[in-house]
Structures are given as structure tokens and as C-alpha cells.
Amino acid sequence: MEYLGVYDENKINLDKKIARGDKLLDNEHILIALVFIENSDGLFLIQKTSVEKGSKYSSTGGHVLYGEDLKGAITRELQEELGLDVLSDELKFMGSMLLGIPFFDVYHLNKDIDVSKLNLQKEEVSEVSFMSKSEINELIDNDLMIKSHGISFRKFFN
């Protein structure tokens, strides 16, 4: 069972944990960390979630576990979902926003990646590809991208 950290409306850690999926109290929040990977051609690595996860497009990211820091969550998710190892100091914090219950903390990673060498976690990711900003905006406009990921992309990268 995964346990998540609980935060107040000011994103202050309440030093409380909750099982993933359990109901939070009013004014309690969890953290989700997202990373947008951009290559030297200005294209972003976008993944398509597995059929079990809705077959939507997204960036890489996930829930921040209890006791885990944000960069640790990003490096863990990159390893789990893509088989990609990165150093936490390669990640640039772009900002945070509250979307309902979760806070989304968004990071940027400049890195040239050979997608053929990625090891995709099939339970989470069906495919990956590099896309331009206009291609990503088209996915968002056509409701093909996970909503929170689309909002994050437009806020920090458009």
C-alpha cells in the first residue's frame, strides 16, 4: 500500500500520512510531481498512458509518497515509467499550482533522449514520442491529454 504525505492549503507539510485513495479532510491536500522533458530541438517527450490508465497523453509524474521529496518523486517516476535515470540537480522547478485536492509541482528537464532505449512500464505507459508545442496544444484542445497535465503545460511552457 502506498502512503502519501498530507499538506495544508499553504502547502505546509502536516507530517501526516494517508493511504492512497483514502478521503482527505477539508483543507488537506496531496502533492503530485510532474516533469516535462525537452530535447535540444525544443520538442517535449510525451507519453500515452496504457489502456488501463485511460489511453490519454501526459507528461511523466506521479504522487509524492509520504517522506519523499519532490525531486525524489520525479526521479523515481522517471525510472519506473521510462527506465530513465536522471540526477535530481538536472531538474528545474517551474512552479506549483493547486488543482482541486492535489498541488501539482512542475519541473523541466533539458535532455536529449533516444526513445528506442527507454524501458516503458507497460502497466502505465503504452508509447512515447517527442512532440512540438503546437502538437501538444492540439492534444489539449481535443481533450486527448490528461487535463491537469495540459493545464500545467500551458501555464509553464506556452
Kindly label every feature range from the protein language model:
Residues 32-63:
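A glycine-rich, hydrophobic loop/mini-helix early in the fold
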Residues 45-46, 58-92:
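The catalytic Nudix box helix
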Residues 23-28, 95-106:
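Acidic pyrophosphate-coordinating catalytic loop
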Residues 1-34, 40, 49:
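Acidic, metal-coordinating catalytic segment for phosphate/diphosphate chemistry
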Residues 11, 92-97, 117-118:
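Short helix-to-loop capping/linker segments positioned immediately adjacent to catalytic or ligand/cofactor-binding
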Residues 6, 37, 46, 108-109, ...:
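Conserved hydrophobic "DFG−1" position in protein kinase catalytic cores
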Residues 85, 92-95, 106-110:
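Polybasic "coupling" helices that flank or enter modular domains
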Residues 52-56, 66, 99-158:
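Nudix hydrolase/Nudix homology domain
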